[in-house]
Amino acid sequence: MNTELPGTEHLRFRQLRHFVDHLRRRLSEPLPGLDAQLRMAPNPRMWPEPRAVLRPAAALLLIYPHDGAWHIPLTVRGATLRHHTGQVSLPGGRLDHPDESVEQAALREAQEEIGVAPNTVEIIGRLTPVPIAVSGHLLQPVVGVVQDRPAFSLAAFEVERLIEFPVARLTEPGAVGSEQRVRPGTPRDVQVIPYFDADGARIWGATAMVLAEFAAIVHDLEEASRARR
């Protein structure tokens, strides 16, 4: 039996389009960029050498409605991967060939890693690229949206588990923590690592920097919405 009131589905669709339209418009304007990213960057951060040639890579920041709130799918990377094993990340990877766009690569990786069909995703913009010294990549985050929660299917060897992360948590008080770690390759060089908490999993590094910029954009949209009331 359908317990939804008449027009509920239409109202939900209108709310979805309203948010997406405002987000698309904000992504077409100057982005928060490095200033926002650095709020979640390890300190001191490992930057690539000035003359380093970074290989292009892409990641999909996908937003979808679930349980009455917007969510982002994040993956805990499998233990057999070459880089960033066990870390929380967005679905993504390097471009397969020179003719592949970052949008195509992001959609392909999301399909391979978490089973999201590319034809269900509406690409609405890009965030600021993040250079990653450890893997030698320049990561281009791509923002996409789907109307409904995807039927996720995880790649067994690449993804240990899926985290459905609420967008609202990015701007909640107390969302950010930090810890100290010894910097890789040094005996005493300590880094302060900021992180978002995701049900006990810590989101740090490049993924946290991407989410920090997205959080700044969400904050802008929230402020604009309050100003219109």
Model-found features: residue ranges?
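N-terminal leader/linker segments that precede catalytic domains of diphosphate-processing enzymes
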Residues: 1-89, 94-112, 116-140, 145-149, ...
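NUDIX/MutT-family hydrolases
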Residues: 154-184, 188-197
